[in-house]
Amino acid sequence: DTFRTLTLIDGQKISEQKSMSGASILIDPNSIERIEVIKGPASVLYGSDALGGVVNIITKKGSKKPFEAEGSVAWNGAGHGWAETISLGGTYKGLNYHLDAGYQSHGNIKTPLGYQKGTDFRQKNASAFLSYDFNEHFTAGLRADTFDSDINSSSWEYEQDPNSEFFVRIPKWKRDKVALFAEGKNLNEYLTRLRWDGYWQKNHKNMRNYVSQPQGPMKVVPILTPITESNLTEQVFRLTG
């Protein structure tokens, strides 16, 4: 059940308006270091939202070298689109940093039957991470990221039968986030770990649905919903040990 599966980024919840099943990820795969999955009884520690399990996305941090950079450029012939990414980071005298950015723009997908309408999309993102090890026991840092997309979808039946036309248009789906953390390790013989997290997050989405339904043998009635605009902003502070 996607409504009962909790999605986290670096242990912090992704907010989502319940206009569709589950929560949108809204993160570039290039920013992901690994993904942890928690199933079974342990997931109930995260609350009722996690009865189906927990997916925790761990983002990239700076490498162990003082400086490291990489980039990529890819061409997608099916959608005549480009995707570019760049990232850099490192560690120097207790300072750990990582920056990355990406941009994609793709047209409609080409299939043996022609171009599939409503499959074009655009996406841009950027993130920055910075932390400092004050000593072997205490670390503090921050992360800021933004993800902005423009996506569409349509049913193939539209190409075969105009009476079943359908599409969804999401010209704006954006997530902005700023997070702070402080963590202590091996503070004494009784307290091995203490962590504080605080973050501000905003999810902004515009969405429009269009469907044409046949009413009788010859009549087709189009139904176009107005643009639904929703904003969800939250501030969370949490202390764990």
What do the predicted segments below correspond to?
Residues 94-97, 137-140, 187-194, 204:
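Repeated loop/turn-to-beta-strand initiation elements of outer-membrane beta-barrel proteins
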Residues 53, 67-69, 82-86, 95, ...:
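Hydrophobic, lipid-facing positions within transmembrane beta-strands of outer-membrane proteins
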